[in-house]
């Protein structure tokens, strides 16, 4: 018997579909650009003038126009959605709050990272190992995740978060440090 070998299938890095199915996704224009840069021979096979003429020869002119209008609308919606997400990310800010526990003990609370699709548990674990302290993920008063790190490592945490945001090409995001002190109780009369 002959051995059956598995097929090697290329996947689009933009939409994660095989390139033949990119046209059914919402990011077709970006998929097409990626395919032209990375797989020029497959691009020619799928989107050359001859291939497009063969594929559309069975469609009537009205149907073809209707389909192209629908695709343009979907692409415009997808681009607008991506633009809104980017604006939301750029307008948000990360807050690092230094909270005094006792006289010389501090914890820092890091909030505002949930917008950036960062896994909070992994980041807390990274902080715990990087700064040799305890770190956990809790919900704050607004029911949003925040990372609590024991110890006064706010400067180091700020540097690390800024570096993390730079890797995601979000240099304009503000990382704000706040120093919160406990209110002293008035002495008993």
Swiss-Prot record:
SUPFAM superfamilies in alphabetical order: eIF1-like
Record keywords: Cytoplasm, Ribonucleoprotein, Ribosomal protein
GO-annotated molecular function: mRNA binding; translation initiation factor activity
Main localization category: cytoplasm
Location(s) in or outside the cell: Cytoplasm
Domain (SUI1): residue spans on this chain: 94-165
Membrane listed as a keyword: no
Entry's Gene Ontology cellular component terms: cytoplasm; ribonucleoprotein complex; ribosome
Gene3D superfamilies documented for this protein: SUI1-like domain (3.30.780.10)
Cytoplasm is among the record's keywords: yes
Protein origin, superkingdom: Eukaryota
GO BP of this protein: formation of translation preinitiation complex; translation reinitiation
PROSITE patterns found in the cross-reference section: SUI1
Known partners and oligomeric status: Interacts with the 40S ribosomal subunit.
PANTHER family per UniProt: DENSITY-REGULATED PROTEIN (PTHR12789:SF0), DENSITY-REGULATED PROTEIN HOMOLOG (PTHR12789)
Entry text on domains: The SUI1 domain may be involved in RNA binding.
Entry similarity comment: Belongs to the DENR family.
The protein, known as: Translation machinery-associated protein 22
Gene that encodes the chain: TMA22
């Amino acid at each position: 018997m002959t051995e059956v070998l598995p097929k090697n299938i290329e996947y689009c890095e933009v939409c994660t579909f095989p390139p033949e199915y990119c046209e059914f996704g919402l990011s077709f224009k970006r998929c097409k650009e990626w395919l032209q840069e990375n797989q020029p021979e497959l691009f020619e096979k799928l989107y050359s003038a001859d291939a497009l003429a063969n594929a559309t020869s069975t469609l009537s002119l009205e149907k073809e126009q209707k389909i192209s209008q629908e695709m343009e609308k979907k692409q415009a919606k997808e681009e607008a959605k991506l633009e809104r997400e980017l604006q939301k990310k750029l307008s948000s800010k990360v807050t690092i709050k230094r909270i005094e526990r006792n006289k010389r003990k501090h914890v820092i609370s890091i909030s505002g990272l949930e917008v950036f699709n960062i896994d909070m548990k992994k980041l807390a674990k990274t902080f715990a190992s990087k700064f040799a302290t305890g770190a956990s993920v809790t919900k704050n008063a607004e029911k949003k995740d925040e990372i609590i790190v024991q110890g006064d490592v706010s400067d180091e945490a700020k540097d690390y978060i800024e570096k993390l945001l730079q890797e995601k090409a979000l240099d304009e995001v503000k990382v704000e440090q706040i120093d919160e002190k406990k209110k002293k109780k008035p002495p008993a009369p």
